Amino acid sequence: DKPHFILTTNGDMHLELSGFDPACVWEIEGTFTHLLQGKQPDNKQDVVNSFLSRYTGKRLVVLELGIGSRNRIIKQPLMQLVEHEPNATYITLNLPHELYIPEEIAGKSIALPGDIATILVDINICMEGMHPHAETDSTGKR
């Protein structure tokens, strides 16, 4: 497990229901439950800032999963973060027509076009092949 924090504009609480720690998730626009109850969205900006301050100057990955190309609520501040952090990398998984990487961070970015579920399965298969405990034959090859 790596330290992480998740920003999302989804309001369905699926991340929490999938086992992610609610303290590490910020549904920026609130949840449907909050909306139905007339509550304001939680503001975890201070939590995000505290998390990011611990990694200033260190290796940092911003992983974007399926954020529409026009959604600037999350994309813009994270892209600016990557631009200003020397050891940050921006990785985006999205449908080809939704991929957007500005020129300022193009050299620090990876775009993976396609269906997110398929891409994640493919990455998992590749990672399993690189696992140090994978079975090897008598020549030491996997």
What do the predicted segments below correspond to?
Residues 1-142:
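Conserved catalytic alpha/beta core of Sir2/sirtuin-type deacylases, generalized to analogous enzyme cores
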